[in-house]
Structure formats: structure tokens, C-alpha cells
């Protein structure tokens, strides 16, 4: 049994990266002593229950640096004005716990690449440092500062480091930044039990995920407006986590919903309620372009829905590049969903493409090789 440290900058945004973090902890617990380092307000056990992850919280050693509680609250409070500051959080975590990492046999970073003094497995959702090397972004001057403090050098990502990415698209972006291409290990999304037959489902759309500006929930409402204007009586159900950092945006979304009797918003619904919605509605919609993987899109597929998403990022892989499910604008999304509603065809993609056992096996194999 090895001592393994898992580094995760924060669980407070309650999204796909946090599913990966808690799934990694769960995958390694049976064979290793796992310690989770994070700067979070969010309780790992409660979040694991919401995501349906079988995590033994009594066996998980959760450690937060001194002052982490007020720091997490402060960063959540200012996030509406300054953004999530994920790279800063990673820098703070790395520098405050770095002196403890030498006591571990292996470090696993589940929140992107970082410079580490030990052998490591690093799971990249999207490169957080040296973003000025990308063709369409520089990350601002602060990202260059954070990069000097905590970014790995390309040489650091060779022997002794197993680099993984959540999609082939993210692997390509990482290669552009560092000259090293990670292996692809898609995040875990199990088929959801209780899937209704197609003709027993409601003529409605579900939007799942963090209620945040980058998810473009208001565009989803506009898309449903457009589909209804074409004569299709579809409802919209928005359900997801509402982190404190996005409270102003959530109020704007709820204000739009209040003006439309066919739109419902549910904050922080339990997992059972989320699965009920996914298994009883026909269509799933994601509106964030260049989603690094697309956990919500994968959940739509896993629950037997017909899923739609922007024609960019890792979600192209989730939807197998199907042109009639991928859109480039609100108007094109209206066209595709209206056509699907008229045809009323059931989904064609299998629900078990991204099962959690595949993910757990991939993580355990990567850790075994690194050890």
C-alpha cells in the first residue's frame, strides 16, 4: 500500500473536474492510503453523494492548508467580479503544502498540470498555466506570474510524470502549450438506471450543470423560445449546482425563467431528482462552446436522451462528431432541435461509452506504472 496525495485546487465549483477528483480518490482507496489536499468550502462527502460517487469518507484524509476556510470563502465572494482564479488557487495550494509532499510515494493532481517535487500523475482538464502560448489567448499578465510560480517545465512532464487529459481536444491544446501530448482518459459517466422508453418520455429539454455564465444558460432559454416559435411545445428544465460565486448570474437566469411558464430552474437538486429528469425527458442541451469534455453532454447520452451541444471542444467526441447534434449558433441550435422534435427519432449513441469502471481502471493503471 502506497501513500498517495491528491491535489485539487477547489471543489467549490461543483463541476466535472470535481467528479474526476472524487472518483480518483474512490478508485485508489482500496489499495492505497489517500490524502486529499484542497482549498474548499464544499464538503467532499456531500458532493460525492450528489454526484453518485461511492467514496469512503471515513477512510479519506482531507487536509486543508492553514487559513484555507476564510480563503475559500473570500475567493467565492469575489469570483463574480474577478472570475474563479483557478490557477491562483493551484499556486496557493502547491506552495502551502509543498513541504509535505515529500512524505508521499506519489502525488496525483486532479486539477491540471503543476510543478511537483515527486513522481506524479497529472490529469489535465485544460492547461491552467502558460496560456499565452495558445493562438487565441494569453490569460493576462497574472497568468504569467502564476506560471512562473507553479507551472511545470516540459522536461518535468517526461519520465516520472504520467500526463492524462479528459479528451483528445484537450490533449491537443496541452501539446500546443508544453510540447507533450497526454494520454486520453475520458471522465467517468455511468449509464443511468431507470431510463424510460422513448415514447414514454416528456417532450422537453433538460439543461444540467453548474449555473454559471460560461454555461450560457440564458442562451438555452432563447433556444427553447425559438423552438417553441416553430410550433413545438417543448418545456425547459434547468437543474444544477448554484455555487455562491455565481449568485448574481443565477438571479438573472431565474428572472428569465419567471417570465416563461415553460421554463423551470432547480438549484442544487439531489442526485435522485437529477436522474429522474434525465430519464424522463427526451432532449439534453449544453450551450458552452469549447467544453473541455462535456460531463453534462455525456450524462444526457448515459440517460438515453438525444443530446445537443456546440460544435467545438471535447463534446464533439462525446457526440461522435454527429453534424445533426452539433451547432455553431443559437439559430442553428433552434434548427437542429426543431428538426429532431419533428422527426421524434430516439437516440443512436450507446449509454455506456464512458463507464466509471473504465475510468477507475485507467487511474489505477497510471498510478501503478508511476509507482
Functional labels for PLM-detected ranges:
Residues 306-309:
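Short hydrophobic beta-strand element within catalytic cores of glycosyltransferases
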Residues 341-371:
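A charged, aromatic-enriched C-terminal amphipathic alpha-helix characteristic of glycosyltransferases
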Residues 139-163, 169-175:
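Membrane-proximal helix-turn-helix segments that form the acceptor-binding/catalytic region
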Residues 164, 189, 195-215, 221-226, ...:
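Conserved donor-binding/catalytic core segment of Leloir-type glycosyltransferases
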Residues 235-251:
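Glycosyltransferase donor-sugar binding loop
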Residues 250-272:
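Nucleotide-activated donor-binding/catalytic signature segment of Leloir-type glycosyltransferases, i.e.
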Residues 35-109:
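Active-site donor-binding segments of glycosyltransferases and PAPS-dependent sulfotransferases
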Residues 289:
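Aromatic "clamp/platform" in nucleotide-sugar-dependent glycosyltransferases that forms part
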Amino acid at each position: 500500500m502506497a501513500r498517495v496525495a491528491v491535489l485539487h485546487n477547489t471543489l467549490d465549483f461543483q463541476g466535472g473536474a470535481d467528479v474526476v477528483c472524487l472518483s480518483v480518490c474512490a478508485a485508489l482507496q482500496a489499495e492505497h492510503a489517500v490524502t486529499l489536499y484542497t482549498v474548499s468550502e464544499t464538503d467532499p462527502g456531500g458532493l460525492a453523494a450528489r454526484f453518485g460517487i461511492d467514496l469512503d469518507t471515513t477512510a479519506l484524509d482531507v487536509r486543508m492548508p492553514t487559513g484555507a476556510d476564510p480563503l475559500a470563502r473570500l475567493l467565492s465572494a469575489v469570483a463574480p467580479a474577478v472570475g474563479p482564479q483557478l490557477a491562483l488557487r493551484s499556486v496557493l495550494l502547491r506552495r502551502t503544502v509543498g513541504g509535505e509532499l515529500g512524505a508521499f510515494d506519489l502525488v496525483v493532481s486532479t486539477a491540471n498540470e503543476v510543478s511537483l517535487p515527486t513522481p506524479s500523475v497529472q490529469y489535465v482538464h485544460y492547461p491552467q498555466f502558460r496560456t499565452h502560448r495558445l493562438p487565441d489567448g494569453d490569460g493576462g499578465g497574472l497568468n504569467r506570474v502564476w506560471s512562473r510560480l507553479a507551472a511545470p517545465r516540459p522536461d518535468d512532464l517526461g519520465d516520472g510524470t504520467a500526463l492524462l487529459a479528459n479528451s483528445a481536444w484537450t490533449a491537443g491544446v496541452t501539446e500546443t502549450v508544453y510540447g507533450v501530448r497526454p494520454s486520453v482518459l475520458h471522465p467517468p459517466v455511468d449509464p443511468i438506471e431507470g431510463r424510460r422508453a422513448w415514447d414514454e418520455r416528456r417532450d422537453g429539454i433538460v439543461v444540467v450543470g453548474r449555473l454559471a455564465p460560461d454555461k450560457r444558460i440564458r442562451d438555452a432559454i432563447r433556444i427553447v423560445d425559438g423552438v417553441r416559435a416553430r410550433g413545438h411545445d417543448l418545456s425547459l428544465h434547468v437543474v444544477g449546482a448554484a455555487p455562491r460565486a455565481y449568485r448574481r448570474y443565477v438571479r438573472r437566469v431565474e428572472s428569465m425563467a419567471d417570465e416563461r411558464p415553460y421554463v423551470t430552474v432547480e438549484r442544487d437538486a439531489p442526485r435522485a431528482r437529477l436522474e429522474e429528469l434525465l430519464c424522463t425527458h427526451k432532449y439534453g442541451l449544453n450551450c458552452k462552446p469549447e467544453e473541455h469534455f462535456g460531463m453534462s453532454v455525456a450524462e444526457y447520452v448515459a440517460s438515453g436522451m438525444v443530446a445537443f451541444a456546440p460544435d467545438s471542444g471535447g463534446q464533439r467526441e462525446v457526440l461522435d462528431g454527429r453534424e445533426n447534434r452539433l451547432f455553431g449558433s443559437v439559430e442553428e441550435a433552434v434548427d437542429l432541435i426543431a428538426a429532431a422534435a419533428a422527426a421524434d427519432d430516439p437516440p443512436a449513441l450507446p449509454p455506456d461509452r464512458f463507464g466509471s469502471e473504465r475510468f477507475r481502471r485507467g487511474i489505477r493503471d497510471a498510478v501503478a506504472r508511476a509507482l
